[in-house]
Amino acid sequence: MDAYELVTRNTAEIVTEDELRALLNKPTKRVYTGYEPSGEIHLGHLVTINKLMDMKAAGFDVVVLIANLHAYLNRKGTFEQIKELADYNKACIEAVGLKGAEFVLGTDVQLTPKYQTEVLTLCQQITLNRATRSMDEVGRAMDNPMVSQMVYPVMQVVDIPTLNVDAAVGGIDQRKIHMLAREHLPTLGYKPPVCIHTPIVNGLDGEKMSSSKGNVVSVADSPEEIKKKMKKAFCPPETEGNPILQIFRYNVFPRMDTIAIRRPEKFGGDLEFHSYAELEAAYAGGKIHPMDLKAACGDALTELLADAYAYVQSYKN
């Protein structure tokens, strides 16, 4: 798999493909994703973490913004509460597999006069309506938003040149914010970033993923908890929108070469798959029972998250 295939696999959109190809030819290139400290790192985060790992393998320097100031503006707690969670999330991101990245705490770079001046300059250009729509897109629909929450997307735009990155990775829900960056950063004298958008995956019940709903698997889940969640998970005969198949596609196969489906001989014996396409075809053809697929998914996730779970236990103890 060449660098372009590695970067673009399991993506929903690349803006733009030509710009990405040109960027890949440069000897030095930087990419970032920002994570607002909030709760446990879970499979939703792992989609973009895996993409950052792909990009590191493709020759990018990877920057992770731990967006504590964004979290504060989004009313997620006091600075002290958010700082503790930021340190914890950073360690979990590393433990889940992202090694050698540069981690930047938001307040270390976002309170300078230059940064704040650029935010205020863009506030003169971006309408309130457009800022609101961009926040709605990332799942923060608000009937009565605070001014601080409207500054949030503008800050995300300024984060890109502040971190000196060439590309931004995010879920497809970040698209409107990234398009703001591509449109408005040239007015400040900066090049528009290449944007790599990943799909938004479903929760275990087939609905929108939400920690509050309990339809996610996180790094804090024990092997027993993962097994229990898999048993209850929605796994329809169809492949479209199937949360278990999505986990295999976006979380498991990017990190594991072979997946085993363990079955008694009377049910056909064990099966091995070396690609997601093989697994999906077998499931679509009725060759794998949903319970067997879910059990294999639980085993794979337990292995994949073992180091992160061990860190969580040591942190809590």
From Swiss-Prot:
Its main location: cytoplasm. ATP binds at residue 211. The gene is tyrS. InterPro entries: aa-tRNA-synth_I_CS, aa-tRNA-synth_Ic, Rossmann-like_a/b/a_fold, Tyr-tRNA-ligase, Tyr-tRNA-ligase_3, Tyr-tRNA-ligase_arc/euk-type, Tyr-tRNA_synthase. A motif ('HIGH' region) lies at residues 37-45. Keywords: Aminoacyl-tRNA synthetase, ATP-binding, Cytoplasm, Ligase, Nucleotide-binding, Protein biosynthesis. L-tyrosine binds at residues 32, 152, 156, 159, 174. The keyword Aminoacyl-tRNA synthetase applies. It catalyses: tRNA(Tyr) + L-tyrosine + ATP = L-tyrosyl-tRNA(Tyr) + AMP + diphosphate + H(+). GO terms for molecular function: ATP binding; tyrosine-tRNA ligase activity. Pfam families: tRNA-synt_1b. This is Tyrosine--tRNA ligase. PROSITE patterns: AA_TRNA_LIGASE_I.
